[in-house]
Amino acid sequence: LLLDLLRLGAYQLLYMDGVPSYAAVSQTVQQVRSLAGKGGAPLANGVLRSLEREGGDLDRFPPFETSPLEHLTTWGSHPPWLLRRWLGRWSPDQVRSLVELNNAPAPVYFRPLGVEPGEARDRLREMGWEASLLGDGIPCLLLGSGTDPALLLQEVPGIVQDPGAALVTLYAHPEAGIRLADLCAAPGGKALALAHQGAYVLAADPSLPRLRVLRENVERVGGRVWVVAARAQEPPVGECPMVLLDVPCSGTGTLRRHPDARWRLTPETLRELVDLQERILEGAAPLVPAGGHLVYATCTLEEEENEGQVRTFLARHPEFHLKETGAVPARYLDEMKRLRVLPQETGFDGAFAARLERGS
């Protein structure tokens, strides 16, 4: 705790021009005294006073041009093992863009449901809120800074949803009136959106608190969504013409929304997630009839959770094949017509999806 408080104080001294140095030092020392014990207060005062006098030598960061890994580890505050993976796939400049985005405040997007985005934007502007259309047929609005989503949700039916997640539902492209099982549903944004795209959705998840939030959202915005408490490995449904698996994943495409996640993730937990995803896929495959679709989705950037997982599944299940619908612009698709949204290219949260059709 003492180290964390010192880090916060140092950050205020070095990077927050709006906080006077004396205030950063005194407030941090007070917090140390009240939260970490009186004994730590003199140490905190001495460390921060020294930092105030000497300043932080930002030139001590390894140069990006010659040492991108070391630079991005220190300056960008990302774990080296994760950066090594990214530098093995993308250029140093692309990885730096991703790191910068992960460290920046996340924008807030609103997806109106039952109301066209243009109409929702006009209504919000009439109420004094700033909102902008995105283009590319993405049904989300970018909200201006300072907009309170909680107040907005009381005025216009919809959900807070990043365009990356919205593109997953567009890519799934359910036919009107189709029965769809969302087996990893909570907190339910995709289930609600798919219902408003015309599907009859069975939303299953083992988390009761998160399902309560989903039920409240269904009551608020409407939609043909039936909520069930169940594990994806034990599907609460028989044969279903469309199954969505928005599986638990490492979430490396959404690190800007969860700043601590980069430090909690380890290679071991990544391997455990890959095993879990494989089990969920295997459990869901028998539910899909001939001509039906299995949509596998994540919010991670990691190859073994995305392309690798789909490749392994198709090798075991030759009765399935990739089936793209043309429902999203080509710029969001990879060479195999799978959905791939990269934050460093789009500014959106990362997303991946593959639409798999069972042959007749």
Residue ranges and their predicted role:
Residues 1-360:
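S-adenosylmethionine
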